[in-house]
């Protein structure tokens, strides 16, 4: 049975699953069915004792961890570039502003360290959240592992090995010690808060660049063939900074989504998160 399952681990029969979902209206069970068609000998043990959240929630945590690692790499690169710029411009005098009114002298490099420091704060938050991410593991329908107690005839010693084995297999240090049917949706709020924090720092940076471009102190790259406006081709709009601000607004506004989901989970779980969590 196990060898049969291994032989079909990567050739997912999406067409069979798609047609089955029209009947069952359940994404995970449709794939369980499709896997069973490919592995008739193992059909009776596929997904045995598990839940849909064992599949979906553990996958989501893995995806979030990989995504945060990607964001971390890009964030470190941004900090490095800002540090380089700050060093190069540390003696370049400029006028500081408070309330966007002329204040006292500073340097271009000093101002850049303000941007850099906020991204460094975001990096600290990201490292903490990434380091604290754990898998759901396999806790059963309500977090008690009752199905495994039955499958293993009450052998608690064997059951206690399940979550550590899952964590090790998936490259994590541990699984959350307790859960309902799902991992706590507070986890999602942590991740989105980090992303929203990065977005806020990026937005502040883009604001300053746009204001400085208006003052003719710093200007975005402008290509030879670039057109500033369909009606005013001579314009040199700060479109890169505007793109940053626009995307940052979306990320920051999305921060409320997981907060609302976490606050409306009833007891061991509800399905309020089914659609918007995927978005």
Model-assigned labels for residue ranges:
Residues 1-146, 152-167, 228-229, 239-243:
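A helix-coil-helix interface module used to build multimeric assemblies
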Residues 9-14, 222-228, 263-271:
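Short acidic (Asp/Glu) and glycine-rich catalytic loops that position anionic groups and cofactors
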Residues 17, 65, 185-192, 271-272:
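Glycine- and acidic
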Residues 250-279:
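Long, amphipathic alpha-helical stalk/connector segments used for oligomerization, subunit docking
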């Amino acid at each position: 049975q196990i060898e049969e399952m291994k032989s079909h681990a990567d050739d997912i029969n999406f067409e069979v699953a798609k047609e089955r979902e029209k009947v069952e209206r359940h994404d995970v069970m449709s794939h369980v069915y499709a896997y069973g068609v490919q592995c008739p000998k193992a059909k009776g043990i596929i997904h045995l004792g598990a839940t849909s959240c064992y599949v979906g929630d553990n996958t989501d945590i893995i995806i979030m961890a990989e995504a945060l690692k990607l964001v971390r790499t890009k964030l470190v690169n941004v900090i490095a570039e800002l540090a380089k710029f700050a060093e190069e411009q540390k003696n370049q005098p400029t006028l500081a502003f408070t309330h966007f009114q002329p204040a006292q002298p500073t340097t271009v490099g000093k101002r850049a360290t303000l941007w850099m420091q906020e991204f460094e704060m975001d990096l600290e938050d990201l490292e903490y959240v990434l380091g604290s991410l754990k898998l759901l593991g396999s806790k059963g329908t309500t977090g008690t592992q009752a199905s495994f107690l039955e499958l293993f005839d009450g052998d608690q010693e064997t059951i206690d090995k399940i979550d550590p084995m899952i964590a090790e297999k998936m490259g994590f240090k541990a699984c959350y010690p307790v859960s309902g049917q799902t991992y706590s949706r507070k986890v999602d709020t942590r991740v989105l808060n980090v992303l929203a924090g990065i977005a806020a720092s990026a937005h502040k940076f883009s604001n300053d660049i746009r204001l400085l471009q208006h003052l003719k102190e710093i200007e975005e790259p402008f290509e030879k063939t670039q057109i500033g406006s369909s009606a005013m081709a001579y314009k040199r709009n700060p479109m890169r900074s505007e793109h940053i601000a626009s995307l940052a607004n979306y990320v920051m506004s999305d921060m409320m989504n997981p907060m609302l989901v976490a606050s409306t989970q009833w007891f061991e779980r509800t399905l309020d998160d089914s659609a918007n969590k995927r978005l």
